[in-house]
């Protein structure tokens, strides 16, 4: 009762009863005592010194493993990586494990619970209230953290309004456990292009994002999302995928129906950039990618097919590629059974595109589209997908650390274990440079000097 009363008092100050309910639900779901939760959420004081003893360290800078390294933490930051712990110091012993920087997932949806078919999506928008979805979202945020993702970029609430802003803020205020979050609030698309679709014209149904038409309305929508707390702007640039032969022998081109006009896209990108907000574009195929690159977005999401000329432009302009491989494989069978067999063809096309992107020198950031698959599935499966598609384990790890931090503009704070950066540390048994699948078994997670998993 005391915890509920305290939570109610604090949340009323923030005018958000939803966050309070979500906090209580997340605590109960985790099966932790309130005392343990309080200890784990305590913000590290500036003078608190802790030492983490690692059997091996991959610091995210050189990717050359160093053996028997002790990391000194002061408050929520790393102080040094070459200082022995004095007698009587607080030491977390990970001498049997490999330590590495907290991981970064640059494409998530904490407010989705799996989206294989249209029915899966419709159910969540029609039968789950925004409040209920927010509660589930707080649990998913905690799962992301315990999987080892200490930072995520959540790219759209899919009909849950601005709940991502509340979750982000509650995490930042240590009300609930979760990763650092950059959020995109409501994504943007044109009328008639995004679910819910196919209902009778006289039936009013919710939509998974904000519908906008015309350059002026597009600018207004960007301003609205920023005013409600968006760190990023998310746009949907294509739909209606189909395959046809390309100009080269054996080439398959994944084509599409573009959504926004180039003028509309340019208006949104210009407005976002004027207000110091980057833009992520859902662009799966030929035209959506090309228009997004021409408009100057900051990242291409999915990119199952990207023409060579656009890959060259992305490399030249510094546009990031967030491929989300695993989710495409996860949903393909279900969507094919629903009447869209193109999703089965897209797997091979995606692999071919990924290999060309690597060769072209495009910056590739790790992103999973978690929420597109159930959050009980470990998003770290994406690492194995990236290696199977042609990356080395080191490249895959770099995509989820240094490259991810650069995409998010957080390279001064995260992405490596070095003095001055946040004490975001994860640990695994085994060597992820030899077998990236060990990242699916992370058993120690620290964010900002606070232990959320393991290390007792």
Q: What residue spans do the PLM features occupy?
A:
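His/Asp/Glu-enriched, well-ordered alpha-helical/loop segment
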Residues: 123, 274-278, 346-432
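Histidine-rich, glycine-flanked metal-binding segment
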Residues: 36-37, 42-48, 57, 62-100
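Divalent metal-dependent hydrolysis catalytic cores, especially in the metallo-beta-lactamase
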Residues: 136-163, 177-187, 230-240, 278, ...
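Active-site gating loops and adjacent loop-to-helix segments of metal-dependent hydrolytic enzymes
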Residues: 111-133, 191-206, 241-259, 316-347
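Histidine/acidic residue-rich metal-binding segments in metalloenzymes
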Residues: 214-237, 242-321, 345-364
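Histidine/acidic-residue-rich catalytic or RNA/ligand-binding cores of hydrolases
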Residues: 115-117, 164, 193, 244-246, ...
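Bacterial N-terminal signal peptides
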Residues: 16-27
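Metal-associated gating/positioning segment near the N- to mid-region
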Residues: 97-175, 191-194, 198-201, 295
């Amino acid at each position: 009762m005391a915890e509920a009363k305290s939570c109610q008092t604090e949340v009323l100050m923030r005018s958000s009863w939803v966050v309070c309910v979500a906090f209580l639900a997340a605590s109960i779901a985790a099966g932790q005592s309130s005392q343990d939760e309080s200890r784990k959420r305590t913000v590290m004081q500036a003078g608190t010194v802790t030492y983490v003893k690692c059997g091996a360290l991959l610091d995210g800078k050189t990717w050359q493993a160093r053996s028997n390294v002790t990391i000194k933490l002061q408050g929520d930051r790393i102080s040094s990586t070459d200082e022995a712990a004095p007698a009587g110091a607080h030491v977390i012993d990970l001498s049997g494990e490999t330590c590495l920087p907290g991981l970064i997932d640059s494409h998530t949806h904490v407010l989705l619970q799996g989206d294989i078919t249209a029915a899966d999506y419709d159910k969540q928008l029609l039968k789950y209230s925004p409040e209920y979805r927010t509660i589930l979202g707080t649990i998913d945020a905690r799962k992301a953290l315990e999987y080892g993702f200490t930072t995520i970029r959540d790219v759209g609430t899919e009909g849950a309004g601005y709940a991502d802003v509340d979750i982000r803020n509650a995490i930042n205020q240590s009300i609930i456990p979760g990763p650092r979050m950059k959020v995109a609030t409501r994504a943007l698309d044109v009328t008639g292009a995004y679910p819910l679709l196919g209902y009778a014209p006289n039936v009013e149904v919710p939509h998974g994002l904000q519908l906008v038409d015309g350059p002026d309305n597009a600018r207004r929508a960007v301003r609205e999302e920023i005013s409600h707390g968006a760190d990023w702007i998310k746009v949907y640039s294509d739909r209606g995928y189909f395959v046809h032969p390309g100009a080269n022998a054996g080439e398959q081109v994944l084509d599409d129906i573009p959504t926004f006009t180039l003028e509309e896209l340019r208006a949104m990108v210009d407005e976002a950039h004027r207000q110091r907000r980057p833009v992520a574009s859902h662009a799966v195929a030929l035209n959506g990618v090309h228009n997004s690159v021409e408009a100057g977005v900051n990242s291409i999401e999915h990119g199952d097919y990207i023409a060579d000329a656009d890959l060259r432009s992305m490399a030249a302009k510094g546009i990031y590629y967030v491929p989300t491989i695993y989710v495409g494989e996860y949903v393909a069978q279900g969507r094919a059974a629903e009447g869209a067999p193109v999703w089965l063809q897209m797997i091979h096309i995606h692999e071919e595109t990924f290999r060309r992107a690597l060769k072209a020198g495009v910056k590739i950031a790790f992103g999973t589209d978690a929420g597109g698959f159930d959050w009980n599935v470990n998003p770290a499966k994406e690492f194995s997908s990236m290696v199977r598609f042609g990356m080395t384990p080191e490249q895959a790890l770099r995509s989820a650390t240094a490259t991810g931090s650069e995409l998010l503009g957080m390279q001064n704070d995260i992405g490596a274990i070095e003095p001055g950066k946040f004490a975001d540390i994860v640990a695994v048994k085994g060597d992820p440079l030899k077998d990236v699948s060990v990242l699916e078994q992370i058993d120690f997670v620290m964010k900002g000097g606070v232990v959320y998993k393991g290390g007792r």
